[in-house]
Amino acid sequence: MNLFTRISSRTKKANLYYVTLVALLCIASYLLGIWQNTAVNPRAAFDDSDGTPCEGFTRPNSTKDLDFDAHHNIQDPPPVTETAVSFPSCAAALSEHTPCEDAKRSLKFSRERLEYRQRHCPEREEILKCRIPAPYGYKTPFRWPASRDVAWFANVPHTELTVEKKNQNWVRYENDRFWFPGGGTMFPRGADAYIDDIGRLIDLSDGSIRTAIDTGCGVASFGAYLLSRNITTMSFAPRDTHEAQVQFALERGVPAMIGIMATIRLPYPSRAFDLAHCSRCLIPWGQNDGAYLMEVDRVLRPGGYWILSGPPINWQKRWKGWERTMDDLNAEQTQIEQVARSLCWKKVVQRDDLAIWQKPFNHIDCKKTREVLKNPEFCRHDQDPDMAWYTKMDSCLTPLPEVDDAEDLKTVAGGKVEKWPARLNAIPPRVNKGALEEITPEAFLENTKLWKQRVSYYKKLDYQLGETGRYRNLVDMNAYLGGFAAALADDPVWVMNVVPVEAKLNTLGVIYERGLIGTYQNWCEAMSTYPRTYDFIHADSVFTLYQGQCEPEEILLEMDRILRPGGGVIIRDDVDVLIKVKELTKGLEWEGRIADHEKGPHEREKIYYAVKQYWTVPAPDEDKNNTSALS
């Protein structure tokens, strides 16, 4: 072992002895300190009761109760208790109740120009707070296209038309269902053959005619058979006491509304329809200074057609069957011809029982003729042609928008629409020309894209919306630009696009320019339609729109009235609004839940989707037993 190794070994041993000695001394010092402290005051380490308190500190009395009571005079609010809202069933006699077309209420109004048959809604205190029942035995309607030709008797239990129109082949009753052969007063060979006759006079197949209006539509066979030609018809007729013509149309899956030509404008914008039709509709076109034809002119697009069949057309051959004199019928046709000329319409053709007029593409020539034909005058510029909610019908000619080329009689006033189906997604003329604030062509295209995404998401939430044929009649309660309906254009459905009169922008004209149909509506009032009209209801921000105007339960009860048993609902709105709506729908016996926005859970806007449960009035025997028990 070398010297360096021996020195290192001794150094390590010395360090070990030193460390051990220091540790023993520390332990001894610690133990001595504990012994001394314990000997002087054994409680000192754990108890300061004998010590001097800190300056300014007062020891509380540990036995005194603490007082948490309020010492003010304001009363506490009463405890909040959740009360479930319940809406009882209305009487069975109200199963076809139409609040704004009530027969008893109508008797209070003038019969002049059929004013009494127009909309007359109940006062706020008269509004029913009950659910309209379906008739006993109600069944889900047949799916389209079978529904065009057949409907369940239990759903519309009226046989009056089968007797009254037996020889005209309107409708037949067999066993438990109605059959619709497609006949009509003026088309004994059927609606298809009748439309073929029209198609030989004007082109119905090239896509230029997409929207039509049928005045006094009967059971809407004309509109039903136009659908196969890609023409969507707004059919309307008055509320019948027993015949239920519009109700039959809706059961068939055909667009229709309750309506009448009387003293107020039809609830549609100007320049809406490519074609207007009257087949023995019994409207006195030549009377009242031609006001009814002027209303047709208002809603007819530039270059649109008006078709008239039935009295007085072809009176020379049919006057005996109509049980009217030749002079009377001749005078009626003369009146119609005069009014049509005063509107600058051109008579295209009269062949057999059909007569067709065409509205001019613009008013270049018509303004010149006003120098000779003083009547009717053009309506004033402050008379908005698109205002059509309880708006009085005027005996004046609605002016068409100015055209850029003041010499070309074929230039379409307001802008030309594309042919169907390109028309659906093309930028509408009203948007192109900047007629609506905030809606640019770019905004329109973005809105179209947005609703395609939303409808795709809806179909994931409500599988029945995505099931082909499950729904047929749809209504969009706040349609805006019609994006919801446009996204469903390839499905076998039709959508009633509603633009609320309270909406910031009147966009219904844009919807019609897209080749879709719709109407104006105030959702604080009932819609002009029968109970159980729609299979599906879409409501975008409707309850937010009507906050402070009427109660949400009033809107929900109307939605329940027009929705079929088993029908679907999608409501999108602010989450706070939807929570309240969802609670109210429990009283309607809807089953539903709230889902996240399509963008995700961080959006305040949510989606409530629900289904109306199936229920009807009790069976007749059961109802009698209940009545006996109550008495």
From Swiss-Prot:
InterPro entries given for it?
A: Put_SAM_MeTrfase, SAM-dependent_MTases_sf
GO molecular function annotations of the record: methyltransferase activity
Q: Name one GO biological process term.
A: methylation
Q: How does it sit in the membrane?
A: Single-pass type II membrane protein
* Glycosylation sites noted in the Swiss-Prot or TrEMBL record: N61, N230, N626
Transmembrane residue ranges = 15-35
Q: Which SUPFAM superfamilies match?
A: S-adenosyl-L-methionine-dependent methyltransferases (SSF53335)
Q: Which domain of life is it from?
A: Eukaryota
Q: Signal sequence: where?
A: none
- Give the Cytoplasmic compartment stretches of this protein: 1-14
Q: Does the keyword Phosphoprotein apply?
A: no
Q: Under which name does UniProt file this protein?
A: Probable methyltransferase PMT16
